[in-house]
Amino acid sequence: PSASIHLGEIVEVLKEVLEIKGRTVSERLNHESLLNIFKIGTSAGGARPKILLSESKSDGSIVPGDINYSGDYEHYLVKLNVDDDLDYSREMIEYAYYLASTRCGIVMMDSKLIENRHFATKRFDRIAGEKRHILTASGLTGWDFKDPANSSYENLFDLALFLRIPHSEIEELFRRMVFNVVFANNDDHLKNHSFVYDRLSDSWGLSPAYDITYSLNPLMNFKRTSRALSINNKRTDIGLEDIRQIARKYTIRSYASVIEEVQSNIAYWRISASELGIPSRIIDSISRDFVFLQ
């Protein structure tokens, strides 16, 4: 059960580390051993600090994520909410996106909210105690994920074809693209798409989706935003014809039903977000950025 993972003490220590880091210029942090124990996945000053945890399947006890990789544990990446000043968290928003994504048929690892504030997702690089070989699109190709020249969905689809992944996974990638457009996940860069190598079959496959969420601050009004990955040479004002062009190029015959299914879950996302306790003003702000493909 989700209550079996207790992160309160870790969060308090992390807050202390963040405070010390904020006051430190050149002095070496004396919390280095702590950070190593909990395997903080981003810098402690990052906007969304992460830790790796392993939860015992038998009694719910937890250990740091680098201690036990056995099949007796569930292995999680946890995005911690350390901001007590807001009446919602970005982690709650990401969980609402997770619920909508999976309802739309997108393949993701099982995820949950811990104490209604921390987002925990099972790791796909550890399955039944086995380490899996994962590379991002950026890591496979050397493409700089910040460079617009390489950042396109067409490049991502072409890479998938080069890796000879099954056509069903090409269709899955298309579904993710449509979801990201409709639900305004603009931060869908090349590091947010990965591939898994299966050594037994000597083949590559598409990894489960991850980092699908609303990436902007819903409390701010943005006049114009652009996508990390272009579609049909466009980063803004993506329309139905742009999606059709991708569908034709990569033989996605069911594109119309995919679009319909994704768009039909906008109401579900709003209901889920409300049930999670996300304020209506935040739900309305995010929803205004959604794109209805016509």
Set out the residue ranges of the language-model regions.
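Phosphate/dinucleotide-binding and metal-coordinating scaffold of catalytic cores
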Residues: 1-190, 194-294
